[in-house]
Amino acid sequence: MSTPVVSAATSAAGPAIVHCPTADLRGIVPGRVQASCGEAAIQYCLRAISETKRAAVDGIITCPINKEAIYSAGYPYPGHTELFAEQFADSKTCMMQYASDIACSFVTTHIGYAEVCQHLTGERIADVIELTNDALNLIRGTVPKLLVCGLNPHAGENGRFGNREEELLILPAIEKARKRGFDVTGPVPADTAFTPQSRKKFDAVICMYHDQGHIPIKMIAFDRAVNVTLGLSAIRTSVDHGTAFDIAWTGKADPGSLFQAVRLAANLSKTVK
């Protein structure tokens, strides 16, 4: 189909498949990075964004994209989050990985670790705290308890490790959030933020960089966690994993995260108007 049509008949028959004409895709080899696939992935995302803007659909659920493929096609986006933020012209967005028993949001994501400190600002940390608070309040209907990780080992050990990022950037952002009435604790050492005891006490963890949160959430909820773009003027969820080209067409991929992404988007569509 060239245009999505939603009706009782199409719903009963299954989902409508919308084709986006792109470059010739006949030469695609499963499990291989190709620029033509990156181009197609971007075009399908842009089509979904277009349909959402005209209110033809209530939300967007994306499967993983291969960053190397979209770079090969000439697009500069390090991931979906940046593409969607640009297209919806939303300046304050962040990634949250969410499951019922664990959730974390990220101040920085797909950048080299040598660049993390360049992108770490008190304003950005405060924005992510606010976005996380508002999102969990919407999803769960309660005031969330948030835990903020430090950047350095032992959360800086009172300035002995790092360049006092905890003291100069993270703590002021936490204090700003508290003045707004948010329930925020931190900064704490990241190696204790995801213990069973901590997860019972807090609803979400604010992480300073990618692996600080992705490693624990994928160990605990790999097949259940959902990637949610916070701050968008539209609903967008996704899986919490990559393209897994190494097992393409083997039947080994676990669809659990995708199922949860669909469920969360559907539930949010009933709440967000």
Predicted regions and their residues:
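Contiguous, glycine/small-aliphatic-enriched amphipathic segments in soluble metabolic enzymes
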Residues: 1-80, 123-208, 212-227, 232-237, ...
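Flexible loop/hinge segments that line or gate small-molecule binding clefts
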Residues: 75-105, 109-112
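Active-site glycine-rich loop that binds ribose-phosphate moieties when present
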Residues: 82-86, 90-91, 111-137
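Amphipathic alpha-helix from the class-I
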Residues: 109-116, 156, 250
